[in-house]
């Protein structure tokens, strides 16, 4: 059987080598079991949409901190099974950093439960056998995740225009190494940036940050970012209102997702991404090499109408790149 919940994945997970297989749809297991404010965790069945859980938490002043692009469609079981990551990962981490406990069913019907405790010191951490297994080892039926205070009124936005990706990677590294943790730390190349920033940065790379949380922490994070970027006089700061507007329109709702499907069928043009991560010492070389090789070696390069990329998940020892393609089908 192939587990499925929100059906938001794009990697062909329902395709199997077996001609006739069963799809186990868990979307009907859609109860929020508990929101535990004292212990700062929430428990939900696998079919609870992330957006439903998030809205329930925000009504109480809390958040999961998890906000992948698939948020309008994705459900909790699939988010854990695919080892998902969200747009605020630089502060909150990825799903593997958020999961406290789990319930799952093995192939023989055995129900296994991993308790909700802050840490384990004995043996391997079984959570990490389940997280990311994509249904190969078990069916995830229940998830408990950490929750955090939700204080959007404290959000601070910073945006910069720069000439090249190398400078942007250097700035991201300095911010991470100095210990600052903005919830958003994004670097767009000129091509990918044309989808968002032509009104103020056409033809330039763009660096974006959002600091959030306790106002003192947000203020210190923002000041630290500004101080680091000031070491690079070639970077030009833009009005924070432009970045706030971008942020408020970053995620799509179900209506816009449905409209895009219609547009793809009508035009035959669609987009896709490939993500890689790399250490600070090699990420710029990876970026330049991939872009160059696709343009010069890919036999269908002429069908690509846009090729670019952005970094949006940074770590102490490196960052990621999403390579973004628009192409004619």
Task: Name what the model sees in each region.
Residues 1-29:
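Glycine-rich N-terminal segment of FAD-binding domains in flavoprotein oxidoreductases
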């Amino acid at each position: 059987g192939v587990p499925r919940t929100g059906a938001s994945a794009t990697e062909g997970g329902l395709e199997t080598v077996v001609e006739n297989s069963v799809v186990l749809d868990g979307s009907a297991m859609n109860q929020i079991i508990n929101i535990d404010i004292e212990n700062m965790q929430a428990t939900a069945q696998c079919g609870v949409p992330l957006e439903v859980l998030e809205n329930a938490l925000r009504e109480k002043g809390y958040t999961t901190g998890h906000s992948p692009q698939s948020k309008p469609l994705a459900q909790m079981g699939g988010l854990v099974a695919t080892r998902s990551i969200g747009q605020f990962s630089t502060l909150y981490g990825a799903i593997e950093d958020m999961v406290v406990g789990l319930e799952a069913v093995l192939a023989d019907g055995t129900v296994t439960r991993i308790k909700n405790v802050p840490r384990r010191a004995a043996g391997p951490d079984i959570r990490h056998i389940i997280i990311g297994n994509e249904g190969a080892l078990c069916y995830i039926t229940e998830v408990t995740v950490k929750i955090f205070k939700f204080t959007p009124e404290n959000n601070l936005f910073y945006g910069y225009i720069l000439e090249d990706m190398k400078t942007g990677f250097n700035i991201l590294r300095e911010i991470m190494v100095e210990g600052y943790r903005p919830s958003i730390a994004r670097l767009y190349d000129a091509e990918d940036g044309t989808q968002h920033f032509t009104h103020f940065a056409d033809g330039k790379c763009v660096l974006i940050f959002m600091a959030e949380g306790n106002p003192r922490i947000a203020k210190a994070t923002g000041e630290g970012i500004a101080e680091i970027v000031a070491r690079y006089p070639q970077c030009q700061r833009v009005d924070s209102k432009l970045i706030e507007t971008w942020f408020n329109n970053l995620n799509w709702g179900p209506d816009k997702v449905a409209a895009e499907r219609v547009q793809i069928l009508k035009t035959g043009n669609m987009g896709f991404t490939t993500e890689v991560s790399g250490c600070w010492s090699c990420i710029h070389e990876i970026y330049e090499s991939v872009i160059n090789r696709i343009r010069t070696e890919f036999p269908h390069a002429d069908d690509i109408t846009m090729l670019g990329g952005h970094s949006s998940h940074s770590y102490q020892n490196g960052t990621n790149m999403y390579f973004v393609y628009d192409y004619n089908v």
